[in-house]
């Protein structure tokens, strides 16, 4: 186990890097209002469905079953924080979406391989800070990536370049929230409840396109 000051520095470095990546990805948006609308609607749905609370509940149940000794700190402990932070960090990234779609559409998994390498380094840093919970996040990540790959195989004619751009931008904002709320700990942000915004982004792109056609 790394010393506390080392864990703090490594986690802060990961937070700053995540923040920078999030800003860069958001700047890829073609229409910031769509990203804003996606986040607003996604946040409403996330609060209604209690996405983050459910993720926390899963982490708490795993903690009660598997954590030992000093790692048991209740629902707000290191195990749950590690599970939630790693799940969000590894799933929210647009590289997950793009890589899974690329794999599903063309069979090329090179982008997912690159992402897995990056996730491995991030997991080492997170595990030293948050403990055993990081390991259990891999189950959700594998299911999420596999599901996206399967869906992508059927969605070739659905996701346009504009839809992918806005999904990437929204993912960037979620990475910023993750960096601020979980890694840098500047203020609490229920980033998990914003995950539905990733689905709302292509929906809003389609709606705006249809409205534009009607107004012509």
Predicted segment positions?
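Juxtamembrane helix-boundary/capping and inter-helix hinge elements in multi-pass membrane proteins
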Residues: 1-7, 103-109, 130-132, 186-189
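Membrane helix-loop-helix hairpins that form the core translocation module of multi-pass transporters
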Residues: 2-60, 64
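Intrinsically disordered, low-complexity non-transmembrane regions of multi-pass membrane transporters
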Residues: 4-5, 51-82, 213-216
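Interfacial loop-to-transmembrane junctions
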Residues: 5, 181-200
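Alpha-helical transmembrane segments in multi-pass membrane proteins
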Residues: 11, 15-16, 20, 34, ...
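Structural signature of hydrophobic alpha-helical transmembrane segments
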Residues: 33, 37, 104-117, 159-174, ...
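Helix-loop-helix junctions within the multi-pass membrane cores of secondary transporters/permeases
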Residues: 76-156
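Juxtamembrane boundary at the C-terminal end of a transmembrane helix
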Residues: 204-216
């Amino acid at each position: 186990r790394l010393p506390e000051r080392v864990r703090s520095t490594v986690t802060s470095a990961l937070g700053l890097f995540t923040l920078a990546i999030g800003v860069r990805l958001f700047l890829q948006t073609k229409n910031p209002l769509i990203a804003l609308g996606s986040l607003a609607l996604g946040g409403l749905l996330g609060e209604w469905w209690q996405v983050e609370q459910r993720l926390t509940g899963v982490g708490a149940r795993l903690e009660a079953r598997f954590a030992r000794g000093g790692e048991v700190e209740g629902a707000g402990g290191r195990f749950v924080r590690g599970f939630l932070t790693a799940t969000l960090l590894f799933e929210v990234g647009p590289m997950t979406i793009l890589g899974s779609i690329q794999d599903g559409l063309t069979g090329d998994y090179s982008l997912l391989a690159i992402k897995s390498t990056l996730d491995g380094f991030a997991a080492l840093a997170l595990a030293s800070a948050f403990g055993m919970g990081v390991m259990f996040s891999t189950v959700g990540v594998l299911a999420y990536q596999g599901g996206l790959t399967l869906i992508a195989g059927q969605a070739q004619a659905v996701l346009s370049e504009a839809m992918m751009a806005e999904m990437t931008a929204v993912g960037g904002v979620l990475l910023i929230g993750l960096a601020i709320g979980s890694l840098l700990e500047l203020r609490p942000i229920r980033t998990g409840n914003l995950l539905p915004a990733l689905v709302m982004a292509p929906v809003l792109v389609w709606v705006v396109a249809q409205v534009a056609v009607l107004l012509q």
